[in-house]
């Protein structure tokens, strides 16, 4: 599966989204993943991307979704944010993990907003739900633990049930209609690449269903429109070599292609990373 995606990039050039006629500044808007407030250490809060964007003189903001909100609740927050931001900025939306589910529902509600995006970058996006949710909901002996966890974080059961596998099909249907470039960055790990015991456990549970990153089934990427950049040996949080924030920063610099606005962007970028195939080979 990795070879399939990597080979598709071999002759694809990286197109620029920069429009000289559009004077609006660039804004990187981050849709965070689940538990981003409770467990910021996993990277789902986008903090590192915000810090790196500041170094590149880009505006970068985290959309204040609910850490354990349902996709519908968070979709409304995303659309409210975009309605305002798009009036003043060219927006690149970066969705992290479950943030992709939230953004997919947001697009289904307001496709007109997403057609105005400069680009959409999904990092380890959960686009079709996750078998994690099925496991937690269907195992009777886990129900008390799940209930306690939800109570502790002030969330309801719908926050988990809405993430059942195949429950987020809106993502595929909606993104088929977008005119904005969509890029999916996804880790392709083997068991030996996973340093976290919990990640190895989930990886083993899901492997009978096919290749996975310990959260999502990687064959689901075949359903999504846009460009898939596979990262060999990286887990769901893209921990391998350069981290997710560095990869996304490099990608945004290539997509924007506006060296006149900020020469340091390309001065700090490896010039060999100007095609999709070279990007995936190096990360």
Give the location of each predicted region:
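Helix-enriched interaction subdomains in cytosolic or periplasmic regions
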Residues: 1-4
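A short, compositionally biased domain-edge/stem linker segment
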Residues: 6-19
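Active-site catalytic motif of lipid deacylating hydrolases and related acyltransferases
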Residues: 19-91, 146-150
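Hydrophobic/aromatic beta-strand patches that form the interior of the parallel beta-sheet core
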Residues: 29, 61, 119-121, 183-186, ...
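Glycine-rich His-Gly loop
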Residues: 31-34, 96-97, 125, 187
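Short aromatic-enriched loop/helix-cap "lid" or pocket-rim segments at secondary-structure transitions
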Residues: 42, 130-136, 193-199
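Serine-dependent carboxylesterase/thioesterase catalytic core
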Residues: 76-175
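C-terminal catalytic-base region of ester-bond hydrolases, centering on the histidine
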Residues: 177-283
């Amino acid at each position: 599966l990795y070879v399939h995606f990597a080979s598709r990039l071999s002759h694809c050039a990286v197109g620029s989204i920069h429009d000289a006629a559009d004077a609006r500044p660039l804004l990187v808007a981050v849709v965070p993943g689940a538990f981003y407030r409770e467990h910021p250490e996993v990277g789902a809060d986008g903090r590192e991307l915000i810090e790196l964007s500041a170094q590149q003189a880009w505006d970068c903001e985290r959309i204040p979704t609910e850490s354990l909100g349902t996709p519908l609740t968070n979709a409304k927050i995303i659309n409210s944010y975009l309605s305002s931001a798009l009036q003043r900025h060219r927006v690149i939306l970066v969705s992290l993990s479950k943030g992709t589910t939230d953004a997919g529902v947001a697009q289904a509600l307001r496709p007109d907003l997403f057609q105005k995006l400069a680009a959409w970058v999904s990092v380890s996006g959960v686009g079709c739900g996750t078998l994690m949710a099925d496991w937690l909901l269907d195992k009777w002996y886990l129900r008390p633990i799940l209930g306690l966890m939800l109570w502790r974080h002030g969330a309801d059961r719908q926050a988990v049930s809405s993430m059942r596998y195949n429950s987020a099909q809106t993502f595929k249907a909606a993104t088929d209609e977008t005119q904005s470039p969509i890029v999916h960055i996804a880790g392709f790990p083997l068991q030996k690449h996973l340093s976290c015991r919990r990640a190895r456990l989930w990886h083993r549970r899901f492997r009978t269903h096919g290749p996975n990153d310990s959260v999502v089934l990687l064959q689901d990427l075949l359903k999504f429109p846009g460009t898939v950049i596979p990262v060999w040996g990286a887990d769901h949080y893209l921990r391998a070599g350069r981290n997710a924030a560095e990869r996304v920063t490099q990608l945004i610099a290539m997509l924007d292609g506006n060296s006149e606005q900020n020469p340091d962007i390309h001065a700090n970028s490896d010039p060999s990373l100007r095609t999709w195939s070279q990007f995936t080979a190096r990360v």
